[in-house]
Curated annotation (Swiss-Prot):
Annotated GO CC locations: cytosol; riboflavin synthase complex
Keywords, sorted A to Z: Riboflavin biosynthesis, Transferase
Reactions the enzyme catalyzes: (2S)-2-hydroxy-3-oxobutyl phosphate + 5-amino-6-(D-ribitylamino)uracil = 6,7-dimethyl-8-(1-D-ribityl)lumazine + phosphate + 2 H2O + H(+)
Name of the molecule in the record: 6,7-dimethyl-8-ribityllumazine synthase
EC class (word): transferase
Record's subunit section: Forms an icosahedral capsid composed of 60 subunits, arranged as a dodecamer of pentamers.
SUPFAM superfamilies reported in the protein's UniProt record: Lumazine synthase (SSF52121)
Family affiliation: Belongs to the DMRL synthase family.
Function: Catalyzes the formation of 6,7-dimethyl-8-ribityllumazine by condensation of 5-amino-6-(D-ribitylamino)uracil with 3,4-dihydroxy-2-butanone 4-phosphate. This is the penultimate step in the biosynthesis of riboflavin.
Active site (catalytic residues): H88
Molecular function GO terms recorded: 6,7-dimethyl-8-ribityllumazine synthase activity
Chain residues that bind 5-amino-6-(D-ribitylamino)uracil: W22, A56, W57, E58, C80, V81, I82, N113
Lineage: Bacteria, Pseudomonadati, Pseudomonadota, Gammaproteobacteria, Lysobacterales
Originating species: Xanthomonas oryzae pv. oryzae (strain PXO99A)
Length: 154
């Protein structure tokens, strides 16, 4: 039986971080965490592209373009959707997640979903460097591992 597992060795691949500007107080921290995590694992700044889009709704289309270019080993999607008084939150969060999954399944490029879908701003703060860590950092580590794993898989 063959066992495949990725690790955190720095690959030669480029990484794309696609982040929304909406809720920038949160997303800026997520982006910084992702960049620090990649750099801390041997990925140079010249191998990281940061792409800003207006909001979470626009992340999947940008991810699709980036994935189709074939220039990146993985895409890290970062955003923050906070529940409001209408159902808009549910549409944006759910369809963003579906779009990101569709991109990675159609292109074979790993897309890490770091788009926070939270009830309150305090929940987002907890996941952007607070008591629940930094989801940008976590997505970057998963991206590193997946890039290495994809190189191993037949």
């Amino acid at each position: 039986m063959t066992h495949y597992e990725g690790d955190l060795r720095p690959p030669t691949a480029r990484f794309a971080i696609i982040a929304s500007r909406w809720n920038a107080r949160i997303t800026d921290v997520l982006v910084a965490g992702a960049r620090q995590s990649l750099a801390g694992n041997g990925i140079g700044e010249d191998a990281i592209d940061v792409i800003r889009v207006p909001g979470a709704w626009e992340i999947p289309v940008a991810a699709n373009r980036v994935a189709q270019s074939g220039q990146h080993g993985a895409i890290i999607a970062l955003g923050c959707v906070i529940r409001g008084d209408t159902r808009h939150y549910e549409h944006v969060a759910d369809l963003c997640a579906e779009g990101l999954m569709s991109v990675q399944l159609q292109t074979g490029v790993p897309v890490l979903n770091g788009v926070l879908a939270v009830e309150r701003v305090e929940d987002a703060e907890a996941r952007a460097g607070g008591s629940h860590g930094n989801k940008g950092e976590e997505c970057a580590l998963a991206a590193l591992e997946l890039v290495n794993l994809m190189e191993l898989l037949p």
